[in-house]
């Protein structure tokens, strides 16, 4: 049986996105495992992952918990630039209810997670996700 590298890269991207989204819904520290060491923002601004991790902690600290998390992945795409480098994205829609004491708020919308292939592993280099802002 012949190996299909396209399928493997697509599956890796989807699996990484699912781990990120599920970690988001649980407000889990494991979310950092999917992040690159650097992030590329619009205007080619580059920031370290520690800035993103601090931002995620701040966002997660605004709610006691997230409940009812749901998502649909609509598109996955990537482009390889040699054997060890590439860029890709996973996009779709996501929603959840942010609960704080006796109040709750529904947060939903489109998402797009941007990835870079580094050392054989896809890592997130930019986040567009409901409830997240830089």
What annotation goes with each model-predicted range?
Residues 54-102:
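Surface-exposed, charged secondary-structure patches
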Residues 32-34, 125-126:
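Short, hydrophobic secondary-structure boundary micro-motifs
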Residues 9-13, 66-70, 124:
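A broad structural signal for short, well-ordered beta-strand segments within beta-sheet-rich domains
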Residues 34-51, 65:
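A short gly/proline-enriched turn/hairpin at secondary-structure junctions
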Residues 1-30, 38:
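Short, low-complexity N-terminal intrinsically disordered segments enriched in polar/charged residues
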Residues 1-2, 105-134:
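Short beta-strand edge/turn micro-motifs at domain boundaries
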Residues 44, 102-104:
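Short, solvent-exposed loop/turn segments at secondary-structure boundaries
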Residues 17-18, 32, 53, 57:
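Extracytoplasmic/secreted envelope proteins and their assembly/folding machinery
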């Amino acid at each position: 049986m012949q190996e299909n590298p396209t399928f493997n890269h697509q599956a890796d991207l989807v699996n990484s996105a699912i781990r990120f989204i599920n970690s988001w819904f649980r407000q889990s520290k494991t979310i950092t495992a999917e992040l690159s060491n650097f992030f590329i923002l619009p205007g080619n601004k580059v920031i370290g992952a520690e800035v993103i991790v601090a931002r995620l902690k701040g966002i997660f600290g605004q709610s006691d918990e997230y409940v009812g998390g749901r998502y649909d992945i609509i598109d996955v795409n990537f482009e390889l630039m040699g054997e060890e480098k590439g860029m890709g994205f996973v996009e779709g829609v996501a929603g959840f209810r942010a609960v704080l004491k006796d109040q709750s708020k529904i947060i939903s919308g489109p998402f797009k997670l941007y990835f870079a292939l580094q050392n054989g592993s896809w890592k997130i280099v930019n986040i567009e996700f409901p409830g997240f802002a830089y």
